[in-house]
Amino acid sequence: MFLLTNSSSDLSKAEPTLTHMCIRMLHKEKMVNHVVSQNCDGLHMRSGLPRNALSELHGNMFIEVCTSCSPVRECIRLFDVTERTSLHRHGTGRRCSQCSGELRDTIVHFGERGTLEQPLNWRGAADAAERADVILCLGSSLKVLKKYACLWCMNRPASKRPKLYIVNLQWTPKDDLATVKINGKCDDVMSLLMEELDFQMPVYNRADDPIFTLATPLRPEEVDSHTREVIAPPDGEHEFSADPGGQVEDTALQGGWFGRGYNKGRKKKKKAT
């Protein structure tokens, strides 16, 4: 099975949902081979899904890389690294600890062509699609993903392509090609599936979140290089916080890949003194 997914929230405060955890369990049980996500929220990685079984086609907001190093050097952070980046401007302001080259985010904006091997993993996505007997689309509108012909085996006759199953509340451009289309919420459908398979309902536990073991610590001189809220470790310590003793106002609504332009025209309220 080859899985295409889309989550309902792209905020850095989000945590893996029931659907994310169910997908991870289905992969563990060898019922799902590969997951393709168009989101940049890193939630599939945080669910515990192995990186080699995941293609984040539009990047991951927690990953910055050094393309000057060979092979490309990757740094996973506990905060959104896209604070200073935008279309065609991907430098994060931090430097590689090995070669001092500028680190860049991994986000692929509309109109850009992603070239990074990871976390995009286009090769893994295309190879998985070629081997798939079923494609399950969960919560994705497919308005963007439909354009990627290699994901749908469009080079084959219709009868030779993987069977398509879609779960989404709204219409998708692939509905007419689906073997089954369920108009429902992903968590509800996945919950019923877990019951049908007699699997224990998986629950996200922050103590098991792999991002804490994968994360690259900031160097002392980099501590003030961002103002994003840091994902708190399970023990509550903010080891990598830009301002351990203070608070960052309205961080979820500032710039970055998901909030660009949100604050335009908004008036900032003055604090009472």
PLM segments and residue spans:
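Conserved catalytic alpha/beta core of Sir2/sirtuin-type deacylases, generalized to analogous enzyme cores
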Residues: M1-T273
